[in-house]
Amino acid sequence: MDYLQIKKSPKLHGEIKISGAKNAALPLIAMSILAKNIVTIKNLPHVADIKTLLKLLSNLGAECSSSWENYSTTINTSTLNQTKATYDIVKTMRASILVLGPILARFGHCEVSLPGGCAIGQRPIDLHLKALEQMGAVINIEAGYIHAIAPDGLKGCNIIFDKITVTGTANIVMAAALAKGVTTITNAAREPEVVQLCEILNASGVKIEGIETAVLTIHGTGGELLEIAPFSVIPDRIEAGTYLCAGAITKSELTLKGANAKHLGAVLSKLEEMGSKFTITDDSITIHPSKIIKHVKIVTQEYPAFPTDMQAQFLALATQADGTSIIEERLFENRFMHVSELQRMGADISLNGNVATVNGHSKLSGTDVMATDLRASSALVLAGLVADGITDVHRIYHLDRGYDSLEKKLQNVGADISRLKE
């Protein structure tokens, strides 16, 4: 098993190329189930979760041909001959549930194992299932599997999500794409990753109204498969945010190429509050960090507010701030598991329920730490960049699920970081 070894780094400098967004690519790969043609996806991030979902489609009978050197894949789902997504793959990644809506819409029946993935609290899929039942599906859960059938096909209806769900919105949008009639989703997620899915479906013959709003109206094709043109995955806003935090915590000027600042409004705003300034172009962001990092108050909420996937990185940054920062996590329980590891490095953090109080000017010391989930992994790496001594981050399979070549990208801008074998 691999681990990352990090030594306190001098100022970083240079450019980092931002990869395609994992959280956009996953539903777009699942979307290929709705296609009648071979789908070409470009700017695909080279991360474990993408490989897992492509393997799942291959197990269902799809022909997937990936060129990782070119960050692209082609998917032919005309050869699909299975409708059962088995536990051995689904257990490793919650996003596998994204195949539920498309398979059910295309074939009228499917079995999908209940999902696994990051251990950051309960992320129930009941909202997905309730919506599919409203569309005419009959669903039972037996022996760890979701059994879904739609004997008369899925039918459009009015769906109101009790709470905003990104994966749920994507799943139901894909199901509605092939349904009969019109589906309206109220309280839909507005994340850029959902927006891209809707835009591509819209360009593929599925009329979707209300894109970028909380109310989506999807005019289904009545079972007619889609002609999907080649497309490129949007840049990863969480990866970009992570490297911006690397610049801020090491007080280094970095340029992110291929980043979309329009997707990073809340992150850039909080970094500005903490003293950083930015030069922004259509496809790049350069951070000009402050010599003094200011304290901050952060509340995680759904897009376009501050993303929960950036909470851990900002918590690491706040350990070096001037003053006391307050970080409140409103979306997931158990998403402060990185706190105990940062405390082992010397961070002065106290927890009260879903609120972390971070006292700045912590003198961090390198030690052995364990990653507990994907974004916690990156927070420990950020801390390691400014900690005295050597920091060894273990269980980085979490990191590899969502970051493409993180240690290589940091090495290229001067960080002292290496991937080693246990």
From Swiss-Prot:
SUPFAM superfamilies documented for this protein: EPT/RTPC-like
EC number: 2.5.1.7
GO MF term (any one): UDP-N-acetylglucosamine 1-carboxyvinyltransferase activity
Any single Pfam family the record assigns to this protein: EPSP_synthase
Compartments where located: Cytoplasm
Signal peptide (residue range): none
Highest taxon in the source lineage: Bacteria
Residues the record lists as 2-(S-cysteinyl)pyruvic acid O-phosphothioketal modifications: C118
Name listed for the protein in its UniProt record: UDP-N-acetylglucosamine 1-carboxyvinyltransferase
Any single Gene Ontology cellular-component annotation: cytoplasm
Gene3D superfamilies listed in its UniProt record: Enolpyruvate transferase domain
Protein's organism: Sulfurimonas denitrificans (strain ATCC 33889 / DSM 1251)
Positions of UDP-N-acetyl-alpha-D-glucosamine binding: R94, R123, P124, I125, D126, L127, D309, L331
Pathway annotation: Cell wall biogenesis; peptidoglycan biosynthesis
